[in-house]
């Protein structure tokens, strides 16, 4: 987010050259993952997040609520396989993530979901809205707020998890993930 902010501030004309953005960040109407109210990406630089979302550049926002719809359990992670090196590496990363903390029960696909939606927008339904990010240093610092007006941000609402996991499995040639 910070890099986009810097680009737009230093080169304002660049905004007119961008058709749209797909961003992963924020926690609209859901619990944050850094604080009760804030998601990590927006918490790190809420001023940049708020600025980017207010430019008028069309944004598809994949927030935590969306990402929490595409989770993989520890059991599934240990039961899948791939014959490709890239697929094996992806599985290894997920399994190792679970190994860092025995209380972890679900791996959520944050950036992979944003990438998948940028490739195939039909993976989700959307709410067109205006969004702001709290920038004042209060307990709500970094919180993402949607106004549900006809705005330039398409907030992901419902994700087709089956379609996402089919895409994920096909892309990485993963076996044992799909029924």
Language-model segment annotations:
Residues 1-69, 74:
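Active-site histidine-anchored catalytic micro-motif
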Residues 40-47, 62-179:
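Conformational coupling and interaction surfaces
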């Amino acid at each position: 987010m910070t890099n986009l902010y810097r680009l737009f501030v230093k080169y304002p004309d660049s905004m007119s050259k961008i058709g749209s953005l797909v961003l992963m960040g924020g926690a609209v109407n859901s619990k944050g993952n850094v604080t009760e109210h804030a998601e990590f990406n927006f918490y790190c630089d809420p001023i940049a997040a708020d600025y980017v979302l207010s430019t008028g550049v069309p944004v598809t926002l994949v927030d935590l609520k969306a990402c929490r719809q595409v989770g993989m359990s520890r059991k599934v992670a240990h039961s899948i396989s791939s014959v490709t090196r890239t697929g094996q590496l992806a599985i290894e990363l997920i399994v190792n993530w679970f190994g860092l903390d025995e209380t972890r029960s679900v791996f959520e696909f944050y950036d992979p979901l944003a990438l998948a939606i940028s490739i195939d927008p039909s993976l989700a339904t959307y709410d067109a809205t205006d969004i702001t990010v709290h920038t004042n240093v209060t307990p709500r610092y970094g919180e993402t707020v949607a106004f549900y007006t006809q705005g330039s941000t398409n907030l992901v609402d419902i994700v087709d998890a089956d379609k996402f996991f089919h895409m994920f499995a096909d892309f990485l040639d993963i076996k044992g993930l799909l029924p």
